[in-house]
A protein has these predicted regions:
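Conserved short histidine dyad/triad with adjacent acidic residue
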Residues: 28-58, 88-92
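Ligand-binding loop in jelly-roll beta-barrel domains
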Residues: 89-114
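A short, N-terminal "cap"/entry segment at the start of jelly-roll beta-barrel domains
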Residues: 1-38
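Short glycine/proline-enriched turns and hinge-like loops at secondary-structure junctions
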Residues: 57-59, 77-78, 97-99
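Glycine- and acidic-residue-biased ligand/ion/polar-headgroup-sensing regions
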Residues: 58-74
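Short acidic-glycine-tyrosine-enriched beta hairpin
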Residues: 73-92
Length: 117
């Protein structure tokens, strides 16, 4: 018996994004295979225009693919539709979006909150 799961990107049930213990205003997510205990898995996040993420450090790898819109990293790099981005363990950053975006994320470890610079 197959244990296949098909996720229809145009028909998702988004919930408030609460990975860091508090909800980030303007950010929601749809968990595909994400496990909050291990911080491993896949999810799709939606950021409304003007949304800012919480500064954090990557304890494991995180990769994401921009499905729609664009995301601006704390160093000014702009990630656009079609970009696949890899953050290695030890990376510290935060991001924001002016236009909004939809992101497919692959997590392999915890992100820990850090204080803003």
């Amino acid at each position: 018996m197959s244990k296949r799961k098909i996720t229809k990107v145009n028909n998702l049930n988004f919930e408030p994004f609460d990975r860091y213990g508090k909800v980030i205003p303007g950010m929601t997510w749809h968990k595909i295979s994400f496990d909050k205990e291990t911080n491993y898995g896949t999810y799709i996040s939606k950021l409304e225009p003007g949304t800012k993420t919480i500064p954090h450090i990557h304890m494991g790898y995180e990769e994401f693919f921009i499905l729609e819109g664009e995301l601006i990293d704390s160093d000014g790099t702009i990630f656009k539709k079609g970009d696949l981005v890899t953050f290695e363990p030890g990376t510290k950053h935060s991001s924001h979006t002016k236009k909004g975006c939809l992101i497919l994320t692959f997590m392999r470890g915890e992100n820990k909150r850090i204080k803003e610079k």
